[in-house]
Amino acid sequence: KEMLPILTKPLIHYGVDEALEAGMDNMAFVTGRGKRALEDYFDRSYELEDQISGSSKEYLLDEIRALMKRCTFSFTRQEQMKGLGNAIYTGKILIRDEPFGVVLADDLCVNENGEGVLAQMVKIYEKYRCSVVAVMEVPPQDVNKYGIIAGKSISDDLIMVSDMIEKPEPSEAPSSLAIIGRYILTPNIFDLIEQTAPGKN
């Protein structure tokens, strides 16, 4: 899904652009079987460059070259696809002891009239120094398709999360605020993942 083209570039490129806008320039990818195209996309391909050079598509080449100059890319493989928690834990070797952003590239977040979602989240992190998760309101009948948060409102656009429930039935959902694929996590998440037994949620 990450390589699905939207207009002139794949979803993953938009995710990297969003991270750069938020001030993040070390891109750490957790990949798996069949995801080699991700690594290839962020690498030089002299054959492809030679074909595109001088053509009407050279601007695409310039765009990816510029992106590659602005950040570093590192990759590690998830041995088995065991969910998001395991993918984040697999990335520990690349993250070390720093807070970090998570972009699930198959959630395209566009804010045409302002800052990107991750940039807004960085400001919240800088103020509160805690993990931050992005949410969006969904119709009540659709809550069983998402992770849903419970919590207490701090301000108009900010909620202190007390619980996250994966795909609850509409009658059991604490809200209609669904988690979307943007997180800022602190390194203690790795300890929490270690202490959490595997499960479908």
List PLM regions with ranges.
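Catalytic-core segments of class I nucleotidyltransferases/pyrophosphorylases
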Residues: 101, 115, 122-126, 153-201
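Residues that recognize and position ribonucleotide moieties
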Residues: 4, 142, 182-183
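N-terminal glycine-rich phosphate-binding loop and ensuing alpha1 helix
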Residues: 1-58, 114-120
